[in-house]
Amino acid sequence: MAYVPRLRQEYNERVKSALKEEFSYSNIMEVPKLTKIVISRGVGGAVADKKLIDHAIDELSAISGQKAVSTISKKDVASFKLRKGMPIGAKVTLRGYRMYEFLDRLITSALPRVRDFNGIKSNGFDGRGNYNLGVTEQIIFPEIDIDAVNRIAGMDITFVTTADTDKEAKALLTELGLPFKKN
């Protein structure tokens, strides 16, 4: 039998039926699912120091288990000495098994390492069933060697789902194990 990530198996066995019952869908294919996770990071000092982009790409690659790519500026901004086409950040898009593996590591090992952690805020939904989570330090991930970090930097993690509403998306992410704050 082939390997299946723990959260993928849990989604298929438990979460699908729970969401179908909760929102009374008529068809199992209506149940929302996680499509992709995008981890992105802007590097403000990249205009002056090109090595910062390489460090960001290396760290995102270590965290995600997949090669990250640099993002480039779309237009000139004179006040930042920024030209069109200059690298200004890094991102990685996770789908399939790698997405579920990353989500599992985020829930079980990274989020508990956040100082004074008591759940993630539920105000990061965009109205279309997607959720954005901001992480302030990359050192919460066990894949990052603290001694090798030259600058503490945060990142944005976007969970893209097929849910139509924020309520459905929150129910999906809660069932998968994301610890939202109790209001």
UniProtKB/Swiss-Prot annotation:
Name the UniProt record assigns to this protein: Large ribosomal subunit protein uL5
InterPro entries according to UniProt: Ribosomal_uL5, Ribosomal_uL5_bac-type, Ribosomal_uL5_C, Ribosomal_uL5_dom_sf, Ribosomal_uL5_N
Pfam families: Ribosomal_L5, Ribosomal_L5_C
Keywords annotated in UniProt: Ribonucleoprotein, Ribosomal protein, RNA-binding, rRNA-binding, tRNA-binding
Any Gene Ontology CC annotation: ribonucleoprotein complex
Family: Belongs to the universal ribosomal protein uL5 family.
NCBIfam families in alphabetical order: PRK00010.1
Gene Ontology biological-process annotations: translation
Gene3D superfamilies: 3.30.1440.10
Organism of derivation: Christiangramia forsetii (strain DSM 17595 / CGMCC 1.15422 / KT0803) (Gramella forsetii)
This protein's record includes keyword Transmembrane helix: no
Gene: rplE
